[in-house]
Curated annotation (Swiss-Prot):
<dbReference type="InterPro" id="IPR016166">
    <property type="entry name" value="FAD-bd_PCMH"/>
</dbReference>
<comment type="function">
    <text>Aldehyde oxidase with a broad substrate specificity. Involved in the accumulation of benzoic acid (BA) in siliques. Delays and protects siliques from senescence by catalyzing aldehyde detoxification in siliques. Catalyzes the oxidation of an array of aromatic and aliphatic aldehydes, including vanillin and the reactive carbonyl species (RCS) acrolein, 4-hydroxyl-2-nonenal (HNE), and malondialdehyde (MDA).</text>
</comment>
<dbReference type="InterPro" id="IPR036318">
    <property type="entry name" value="FAD-bd_PCMH-like_sf"/>
</dbReference>
<dbReference type="InterPro" id="IPR008274">
    <property type="entry name" value="AldOxase/xan_DH_MoCoBD1"/>
</dbReference>
<dbReference type="GO" id="GO:0018479">
    <property type="term" value="F:benzaldehyde dehydrogenase (NAD+) activity"/>
</dbReference>
<keyword id="KW-0274">FAD</keyword>
<feature type="binding site">
    <location>
        <position position="399"/>
    </location>
    <ligand>
        <name>FAD</name>
    </ligand>
</feature>
<dbReference type="GO" id="GO:0004031">
    <property type="term" value="F:aldehyde oxidase activity"/>
</dbReference>
<dbReference type="InterPro" id="IPR016167">
    <property type="entry name" value="FAD-bd_PCMH_sub1"/>
</dbReference>
<keyword id="KW-0073">Auxin biosynthesis</keyword>
<feature type="binding site">
    <location>
        <position position="915"/>
    </location>
    <ligand>
        <name>Mo-molybdopterin</name>
    </ligand>
</feature>
<feature type="binding site">
    <location>
        <begin position="342"/>
        <end position="346"/>
    </location>
    <ligand>
        <name>FAD</name>
    </ligand>
</feature>
<dbReference type="InterPro" id="IPR036683">
    <property type="entry name" value="CO_DH_flav_C_dom_sf"/>
</dbReference>
<feature type="binding site">
    <location>
        <position position="113"/>
    </location>
    <ligand>
        <name>[2Fe-2S] cluster 2</name>
    </ligand>
</feature>
<dbReference type="Pfam" id="PF03450">
    <property type="entry name" value="CO_deh_flav_C"/>
</dbReference>
<dbReference type="Pfam" id="PF20256">
    <property type="entry name" value="MoCoBD_2"/>
</dbReference>
<dbReference type="InterPro" id="IPR016169">
    <property type="entry name" value="FAD-bd_PCMH_sub2"/>
</dbReference>
Amino acid sequence: MAGDDLVFAVNGEKFEVLSVNPSTTLLEFLRSNTCFKSVKLSCGEGGCGACIVILSKYDPVLDQVEEYSINSCLTLLCSLNGCSITTSDGLGNTEKGFHPIHKRFAGFHASQCGFCTPGMCISLYSALSKAHNSQSSPDYLTALAAEKSIAGNLCRCTGYRPIADACKSFASDVDIEDLGFNSFWRKGESREEMLKKLPPYNPEKDLITFPDFLKEKIKCQHNVLDQTRYHWSTPGSVAELQEILATTNPGKDRGLIKLVVGNTGTGYYKEEKQYGRYIDISHIPEMSMIKKDDREIEIGAVVTISKVIDALMEENTSAYVFKKIGVHMEKVANHFIRNSGSIGGNLVMAQSKSFPSDITTLLLAADASVHMINAGRHEKLRMGEYLVSPPILDTKTVLLKVHIPRWIASSTTGLLFETYRAALRPIGSALPYINAAFLAVVSHDASSSGIIVDKCRLAFGSYGGYHSIRAREVEDFLTGKILSHSVLYEAVRLLKGIIVPSIDTSYSEYKKSLAVGFLFDFLYPLIESGSWDSEGKHIDGHIDPTICLPLLSSAQQVFESKEYHPVGEAIIKFGAEMQASGEAVYVDDIPSLPHCLHGAFIYSTKPLAWIKSVGFSGNVTPIGVLAVITFKDIPEVGQNIGYITMFGTGLLFADEVTISAGQIIALVVADTQKHADMAAHLAVVEYDSRNIGTPVLSVEDAVKRSSLFEVPPEYQPEPVGDISKGMAEADRKIRSVELRLGSQYFFYMETQTALALPDEDNCLVVYSSTQAPEFTQTVIATCLGIPEHNVRVITRRVGGGFGGKAIKSMPVATACALAAKKMQRPVRIYVNRKTDMIMAGGRHPLKITYSVGFRSDGKLTALDLNLFIDAGSDVDVSLVMPQNIMNSLRKYDWGALSFDIKVCKTNLPSRTSLRAPGEVQGSYIAESIIENVASSLKMDVDVVRRINLHTYESLRKFYKQAAGEPDEYTLPLLWDKLEVSADFRRRAESVKEFNRCNIWRKRGISRVPIIHLVIHRPTPGKVSILNDGSVAVEVAGIEVGQGLWTKVQQMVAYGLGMIKCEGSDDLLERIRLLQTDTLSMSQSSYTAGSTTSENCCEAVRLCCGILVERLRPTMNQILENARSVTWDMLIQQANAQSVDLSARTFYKPESSSAEYLNYGVGASEVEVDLVTGRTEIIRSDIIYDCGKSLNPAVDLGQIEGAFVQGIGFFMYEEYTTNENGLVNEEGTWDYKIPTIDTIPKQFNVQILNSGHHKNRVLSSKASGEPPLLVAASVHCATRSAIREARKQYLSWNCIDDDHRERCDLGFELPVPATMPVVKQLCGLESIEKYLEWKTYP
């Protein structure tokens, strides 16, 4: 083995790579060159955690191994020479046995679609390893550390609660009885019994072994790669680095050299150019050391942020400035980015590219300095000087060290240091709206007993300026002054003139307000108390939200039924352990055949324009590109079709005209996915907007220009009652109120993906991550002009769908098939996250105007609505929206209900179905109206809601046959039960008391009901008993994480168990679900609408009934000559008698049970921080009528996951477009779904086991979509808290109580209620008003 070869290990296996492109990432190598596919590509920018691995490094001097988690999507392969990598399937797998982490994730039902689970497991393992190796408390993993271990990991399915429980089960300080519902023990068992049933974990036996062959290599060699073959240099000293840099021709080679440490910067600044040489500077001792003395801490520039934090936190209590900096730095990015990213890299990005850095702000406040070298000349600059110096754009200037001085107070003065940041996620993985760090030396004024500011440093950053700054005018003003309300008021006014975001900065006024709030929080407690505390005091005794306590214990109440054993039992999800280990196969995990090609989409950036040409800059074809496929490449016998629905079809490629930004124009086909993506990025599309008209970019424009889709009569909802009579009966009316609801992105962890294989006789096999294989088959066949039997579409499992893998997956699979047919080679497409977000469309935005009539007691009499639905450029499934919206809005007895609904055709991205499409909007509209009515009447909104809940008679009036029988209407029961179980009345009073006692924090509590109509669809199923008695099952539904396979497996075991022979009660482990294959399972329709699991279960139950009847004669014959019969004996004899052991049915629901209503109630308590607008969900309680659950564990997961996805819609997720209709949000940096630190702190879910559904599938009900609607309780509680803040704000304007109540009317809380939105409604100038009120009462 040559010493200059790239050698490393993966899961103990040796890999020797003789030549590789230095830009190759570890993720690319693992997925393309190894069998280890547990590392998943989801975001490609270090923001989701799906690609996490453990990196182990050996130090031959200390004979120690260091291990930590890293992003494989950003880590360059060449930087891993001599390292060992461990993936989730390296921790454990099917062959060697699963790791305790895998087993506990499965047992706590913490994996649904499974795409994120391997990364979650690695993050937890990393935390366990760190705890084991800790010097202070080995083997002691706290519950807080367990939860924080997954703070950088995203999950769209579970809602995080079961994941948190799985993680906390390893914590030493957790009360095991507080852990959530699981399959290890049942309620009532002793603590000792519970502990025995947990899969045991022994850290001593669980250590990753660093391979001996790597140890020997490291001991014997310098471990430097051949620079010629790898274009990779690894200097061992600063002098050697200077020598390498000096050989570079500044003119010819400028920009071709890249300095590398962790390569994490490419997650934010995407790499768009080819580098000729990479220099790994992470091995230079002078840049890798941390030195401490009495004056300062000196930190090498390549030291990772994690190691900087450790060094700062190790300091004694007297150096609390260091500790404060360390605590704040734990909020930077996520733990795996901090493990790789260096402090120097962060500072250089901030200085040269205006990266919104927290670290520069911290160091600026602490008066840090940097040590740099340029062409042999050393230079030391203070942080302020460094930031304003000319940007470091060349590779000749290198940052060597950072110096942070020690700050120690004298005996007569106090030293104060505090840091701040406002971000959508409290503990990281989100850039701040603004950050700040303040240092002050203070002393007592003997004459006034006040506090004098002797010295201060006030630093602000990330607000939209070029870099972090000091507010010197404010510092000068405060220095020497005795703090008072008037002094602070003037300081705040000065500060607002300093914090001036650039013109194109979003939320500029909000950011100014935050700066004011931070300064107020720093200084105001000193005024109030007249004393200081080195640990820092906060207004209202406020605890820094980033110093998080672990989630409170949550409660899940479920009922496991034995009536239909094993149906109704909470068995572990089928394949959950394989999902955790990463062995579960998704489309992109299928190995590529030789000569496989890859595709990437070129999309439009214009909403309406002629397409003149598609090419590349300078007419130079990028490396690796073999073809660019457009509509012109569709066979003459085919059609330019990309999708099909019951309402029509849509284009695969834009032909001569693009009708929306984000529309597919072409497909680049290249030899690798990286080359395809890079080529698509470099593509140049020439447009011509002449003689084509003005694009329609709003619903108002659409209505004005009559650009509307016509809704078929059968999809038009019917009005209820006489609206004129209803309005006449009203004592009060609210007229012409306008609401708007934005869009939402699916954020499935697995983006759109497909693999197409040309087959013999003009056939194709297409693997597609789709919810609609049969529709996909039809579209491909139509596009290519071949019979459908020539197209075989296969789907095994989908890494999250939520509706986005239904219609929107079809053009991806179709383009892939077209390319495969044209090139006569396998082609695969894995759409990158940015392109996926731009093309996805997402949830339908709405504009609503309404007028409502009601009596003085709160009873509604009439509602008149005008709805404008933005469908985008294509019809898709938008014509179901009117019916869906009205179905959920009818949950209240409106008296009379009329509406005018327009489905608008715009030149915006085509919208599609997203979990609870239309229903979540309709339910929210109802709540907004109820809130407005209650506010108008000065009534408790909870009372108004209860008054207007349906009686059974009004329910029948609004829902007709779907209402079912009277005993099926459980909503009033749920409403009353939740009041007791959630302690709603007492907590409502506690909220009032809290609001009376706190100025800068307000709480709200709200309870909302939901009604959600679902429809059963005809569904096929097939059950085959094989020779050995094992069972193969095929169903039309797709496993997208909803537990469909598990429920079907249970149903087959129940159905075949009716034969009642020995072994028939234990069939569950002998049943296997097969992947969906359109040539095997026809008429499969699509997976959507929450009832697919029920439909498939009923289809296989009917199959089992047929098989049982076929087997009974054989069983009776055996029993004539034997006392008993075993399952194996029965099947063996049936085979001998040529009994048909395969049954296929087509379940067609009866009209009496084809549609039914789902009921639920949710209550949430929310706290709002008036300084920042941050919301915290204190507690959420849900009671949901699931009928007789087919699997309570699965349904519980669906309820929690849907609720948290709803929180995202109502509170966090902004999915907007620019002036051309192109999506603004492009990835994890700017689109924020909920994370572990944003879910309810206490999360209680109860499944009502109602037995009133005998005509349903074993009395079960749907759980996938309805609970999402309950998340409106969070939004309504936030509205309540804001209302209290607004009342207080008005009091500071010296408005009397009566007038204040009148002024409180008319505010609407937009969706999503993000921090800037909440803060604006609470008052952007609330602090100024408060100080003015205190100064000039």
